[in-house]
Amino acid sequence: MCSTLKKCGTYRTEVAECHDHGSTFQGRKKGGSSFRDNFDKRSCHYEHGGYERPPSHCQENDGSVEMRDVHKDQQLRHTPYSIRCERRMKWHSEDEIRITTWRNRKPPERKMSQNTQDGYTRNWFKVTIPYGIKYDKAWLMNSIQSHCSDRFTPVDFHYVRNRACFFVQDASAASALKDVSYKIYDDENQKICIFVNHSTAPYSVKNKLKPGQMEMLKLTMNKRYNVSQQALDLQNLRFDPDLMGRDIDIILNRRNCMAATLKIIERNFPELLSLNLCNNKLYQLDGLSDITEKAPKVKTLNLSKNKLESAWELGKVKGLKLEELWLEGNPLCSTFSDQSAYVSAIRDCFPKLLRLDGRELSAPVIVDIDSSETMKPCKENFTGSETLKHLVLQFLQQYYSIYDSGDRQGLLGAYHDEACFSLAIPFDPKDSAPSSLCKYFEDSRNMKTLKDPYLKGELLRRTKRDIVDSLSALPKTQHDLSSILVDVWCQTERMLCFSVNGVFKEVEGQSQGSVLAFTRTFIATPGSSSSLCIVNDELFVRDASPQETQSAFSIPVSTLSSSSEPSLSQEQQEMVQAFSAQSGMKLEWSQKCLQDNEWNYTRAGQAFTMLQTEGKIPAEAFKQIS
């Protein structure tokens, strides 16, 4: 055993990884593999390749760096530590990821920072989080930092297979990070384990750009910056004439190059709104993930004509609140069955996206919540605060605006990833009388008439993509917003339950113009982006009564009403009619103008005149002259 120790060194110089699936402990077999055999050679790609395309095998020079460190460390150890007599265990798996530890003994740390190689201190540690790929970088780093007794600066955060990894250069921070293991719980109440191991300096540190190179890169980026538009054009950066003339090779797939670029952006372009990374042969976005801290105000990102193969890469920069994104020319674009699926996948990462590859998208449903306003329990009808009323009514206004637009993909942002939706109708297929409900029959999950247990499960739509796809397949509609009543019947700090009643008409097909009534029950929670997020949606559709049909769409109103909020008074209705006659605007636009000016007729008239002079009132606001 002692000879084995001599050959392999101690725990602190070995690389430890964690198996991502199932692993078992077992004693080290006689003649078992040494540290050389246990080293995961796939890490050569990151450690010494800086995120360039992984070669078919690691080069000999690349693979020898850490081996040289291990043998070099042996010269520092002359004291026969008692650790040599401890029992040695090996945790291995089919995935070739192994961890070698010593039981009942912490690694000696007093000499961790003594050795140097090529001018770089060896006081570096690699932190590995198994299954880390499941977690958002910002959440993971904040969670670890909040539990860690020492402040630390993560370097080169990246994902390898389904693990998250980063580096720290502080022995005390490394020790504190070890203590955090199994102290953090994720959303599924699973403990998060953390492994910390001695490492060589990360790629971006060992290959850091020299001051002269940084200065030249900064000058090049300054030339490419548009001050008026706050836009930085870095397309085809590697072949920039100024950089090539100085023999400076900037490859943005390399971590050191991307890190240098983001550092210059942070220091020189803090108000950056638009970044163009077109045609840089990017096949991964690990290096770009730091942009969420370095340039958080970016609204437009151009990643077209690169080598991105999966939409999953975009999750690494989903912290940006993008409004415009370009991806055309990437292999990932051809992985979707149709445009709708493509838009859905991209909007999963960027819910506020308005334009994709230059095409306008339907406006997403995102309603900001006043975080200082706590929802208090309520048993009565809609008797909550005015803030709560405004929140719900504004949400519904936007929701049905998109629902009736003809493209319902914009509703993705309104639903939780694992939301549920069901539709039911009081429809008997044996009824010979024609009905507008026929189109809803095959999606109906009416438990009174549905007996097949398999269909009961199939007709319950799960996940927001399935829900929006199901809604998109339903007939196109126009809802009468003036008919809608809202009843908030349950409120807590983490949940809001409300029902919506009203009528709508179909706007296409054989049933065009048919009026139907509906009841919709929503259960929602505060979303991750300070938005209202639907977790459960039940829709009940029926034929409208003669009275409902007669009154439907008789008085166009642009805002919703709640069951505790009275409709317009007689005086207000007369003001709307008079304002419409004088301005030539439709009733709903006239009402909005009056409401915006607190029903002050004179002030509303002045506002109308000013906006009309400036050409800011759209043509659809005015009545059509036949």
Curated annotation (Swiss-Prot):
Indicate yes or no for the key word Cytoplasm.
Answer: yes
Q: In which tissues is it expressed?
A: Expressed almost exclusively in testis. Also expressed in several cancers.
Stretches forming LRR repeats? 271-296, 297-320, 321-348, 349-376
- Its primary localisation, in coarse terms, equals nucleus
**Keywords assigned by UniProt, alphabetized:** Cytoplasm, Leucine-rich repeat, mRNA transport, Nucleus, Phosphoprotein, Repeat, RNA-binding, Transport
Q: How does it assemble?
A: Interacts with NXT1, NXT2, E1B-AP5, the REF proteins and with nucleoporins, Nup62, Nup153 and Nup214. Interacts with LUZP4.
Report the domain remarks. Answer: The NTF2 domain heterodimerizes with NXT1 and NXT2. The formation of NXF1/NXT1 heterodimers is required for NXF2-mediated nuclear mRNA export.
Any idea what job this protein has? Involved in the export of mRNA from the nucleus to the cytoplasm.
Q: What is this protein called?
A: Nuclear RNA export factor 2
Organism of this sequence: Homo sapiens
Upper taxonomic classification of the species?
A: Eukaryota, Metazoa, Chordata, Craniata, Vertebrata
